[in-house]
Every structure is written in C-alpha cells, then in structure tokens.
C-alpha cells in the first residue's frame, strides 16, 4: 500500500474509511525503518485517517531477508504508538483514536470532498457495518482512555521550535496585511490599543508591514481603548 504511487488505502479513505489497516511484509534494511515511519505518517495525514500498520515478525522467512515485526499507529500525521522491532515474543500495541476529530477535519477540507466523484464512488468496496456502542455493551467494562490531550497543542516543547513557530505566525500576518494594503492602496492604519497581548501583536505587525512596504511609521495611528468592568448585582431583562 505505502510503496505504490497511489496507495489503495487512499480510495478506501475517500469512500469513508476512517481507520486504515495495513498487514504488510516489509523487510528490514539500513535506515528503512525511519523511511517506513514517514510513509505511515504521510499516508495518515494525506487520507485524514488513522493508519494501523503491522509488518511480519522475525519468524516469517528463512530466506535471505529479515523482518522486524514493525507495528505503528498513526493519526492524521501524528505517531500515537510504535512497537519495538525484532521481538521474539508476540506483542500488542494500542492507542486511542479521535474519530470525531478526523470527521471534522474531513468536513472542513474542501480538497478531500472534491475527490469523491462518480468514478471513485463506483469502486467495489466491501462494507461491514457495526456499532461501537454494541461492542462496548459486550465488553461490560468501563473504557479508560490512555491518550493524554495536550492543552496547548500549538505550543511546541522545544524552545527553538517555539521561536520558529512564532516567527512563522508573525510573517504570515505581515504578509497578509501587506497584501491588503497594496490591494486597497491604503497607506495609513489605525489600531485600537487596549494594553493587552492582541493589540500589542497588532501594533508590531503593523510596524513590520510598513517597514516592508517602505512606508513611514508615522502612518500608524493609535486609538486608546478603555474597557470598564462593573460588578452586576441585579440584572433586569426587558
């Protein structure tokens, strides 16, 4: 699947599959493991799906190739779990997959929806219906999630990566504002400054944009915004 120009799992994803399983027989070569991981991550991101990959174990062949039993679980470009290779015992890996998040990402991705046309919809795909709720009833156990959700998903842990991410955000805003000013022919900007982080960032973006367009900084006008918050003891609705 992963080694083909157009992976068959792509067609399954377009037809609605959200979890893709790949039972593979990928032999081990120097540096192939890292490349295999990148293929799994890329396909899960391209298909906006969860991709579960399981390769043959060390006892698979007596020929001149070696298998490592590599197992990976990825979700939309992120690696959720991976096994140790070259294990001589059976091992199981598992991960919590956010299906609702995958559904939402597919809904907002216009390119993904555009791929679904009559030719793809007519492909022979075997569909097996089941209900997760019914499976939970059979299990008779309370499901405890092992996945930890990052409360700050847009803030990298690495300080160097944080600086790079912030610079990218800043440059995107500058480029967007510069394009708008050039398109409209406007050479002056007015900013409502409240003293908070948002207005401070807006001021910095305007300063950099005027510098980029070779316009004088005096073209920035500031408007002081005051917000008065009073305690409400009684409220009357008309």
Regions found by a protein language model. Give the residues of each.
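Short acidic, glycine/serine/threonine-rich loops at helix termini
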Residues: 31-35, 62-67, 84, 106-108, ...
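ATP-dependent adenylation/nucleotidyltransferase module used to activate substrates
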Residues: 1, 161-238
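Flexible inter-domain linker/hinge segments
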Residues: 90-181
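Generic secondary-structure signature for well-ordered alpha-helical cores
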Residues: 45, 49, 82-85, 107, ...
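Short acidic (Asp/Glu) and glycine-rich catalytic loops that position anionic groups and cofactors
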Residues: 20-23, 150-155, 185-186, 219
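CN hydrolase (nitrilase-like) catalytic-core segments centered on the catalytic cysteine
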Residues: 3-93
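Structural beta-strand/beta-sheet cores of well-ordered domains, especially the beta-sheet scaffolds
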Residues: 47-49, 67-71, 75, 90-95, ...
């Amino acid at each position: 699947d992963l080694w083909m120009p157009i992976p068959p799992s792509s067609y399954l994803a377009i037809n609605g599959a959200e979890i893709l399983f790949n039972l593979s027989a990928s032999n081990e070569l120097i540096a192939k493991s890292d490349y295999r991981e990148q293929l799994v991550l890329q396909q899960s991101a391209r298909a906006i799906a969860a991709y579960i990959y399981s390769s043959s174990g060390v006892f698979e062949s007596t020929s001149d190739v070696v298998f490592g039993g590599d197992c990976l679980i990825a979700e939309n470009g992120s690696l959720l779990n991976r096994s140790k290779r070259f294990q001589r015992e059976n091992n199981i890996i598992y991960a919590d997959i956010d299906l609702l998040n995958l559904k939402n990402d597919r809904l907002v991705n216009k390119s993904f929806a555009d791929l679904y046309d009559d030719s793809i919809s007519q492909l022979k795909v075997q569909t097996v219906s089941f209900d997760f709720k019914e499976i939970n009833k059979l299990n008779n156990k309370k499901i405890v999630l092992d996945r930890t959700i990052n409360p700050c998903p847009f803030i990298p842990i690495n300080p160097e990566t944080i600086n790079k991410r912030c610079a990218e955000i800043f440059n995107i805003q500058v480029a967007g504002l510069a394009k708008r000013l050039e398109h409209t022919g406007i050479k002056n900007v007015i900013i409502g400054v409240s003293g908070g982080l948002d207005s401070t960032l807006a001021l910095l973006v305007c300063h950099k944009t005027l510098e980029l367009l070779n316009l004088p900084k005096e073209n920035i006008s500031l408007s002081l915004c005051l917000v008065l918050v009073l305690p409400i003891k009684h409220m009357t609705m008309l």
